[in-house]
């Protein structure tokens, strides 16, 4: 798949951040978990009741979404319709389900 232009990538990344936000809100409501979501530009911050955070942001030069969680730092690159971890091949929403569940202290399934 050829690289996208910066504007194409930013539009795609914004759409994905919107989807992540809606998915996290729905999962948190279903599990009665307290997760505060804030966004500034291409950076999304999820703050949990225990004070921990997950930061998700787009990196246009690398055409990746980066996730910083208590479990570590992760880079996801678009592969068709999915975002795949550049190190272990894991899918973004499966990975986020694990990170969010760990930090929320409740089982949440995203995506």
Swiss-Prot record:
Function: Involved in iron-sulfur (Fe-S) cluster assembly. May act as a regulator of Fe-S biogenesis.
Alphabetical list of Pfam families matching this protein: Frataxin_Cyay
InterPro entries: CyaY, Frataxin/CyaY, Frataxin/CyaY_sf, Frataxin_CS
Domain of life: Bacteria
Keywords: Iron, Metal-binding
Phylogenetic classification of the source organism: Bacteria, Pseudomonadati, Pseudomonadota, Betaproteobacteria, Burkholderiales
GO MF: ferric iron binding; ferrous iron binding
SMART domains registered for this protein in UniProt: Frataxin_Cyay
Source organism of the structure: Cupriavidus necator (strain ATCC 17699 / DSM 428 / KCTC 22496 / NCIMB 10442 / H16 / Stanier 337)
Family, similarity comment: Belongs to the frataxin family.
SUPFAM superfamilies the record matches: Frataxin/Nqo15-like (SSF55387)
NCBIfam families according to UniProt: FeS_CyaY
Any GO BP: iron-sulfur cluster assembly
Name assigned to this protein: Iron-sulfur cluster assembly protein CyaY
Single GO cellular component term: cytosol
């Amino acid at each position: 798949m050829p690289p996208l232009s910066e504007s194409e990538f930013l539009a795609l990344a914004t759409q994905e951040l919107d989807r992540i936000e809606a998915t996290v809100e729905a999962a948190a409501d279903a599990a009665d978990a307290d997760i505060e979501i804030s966004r500034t530009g291409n950076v999304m911050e999820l703050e949990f009741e225990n004070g921990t955070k997950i930061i998700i942001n787009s990196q246009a030069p690398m055409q990746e979404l980066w996730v910083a969680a208590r479990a570590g730092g992760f880079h996801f690159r678009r592969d068709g319709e999915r975002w795949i971890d550049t190190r272990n091949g894991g899918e973004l929403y499966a990975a986020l389900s694990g990170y969010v569940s760990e930090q929320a202290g409740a089982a949440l399934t995203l995506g």
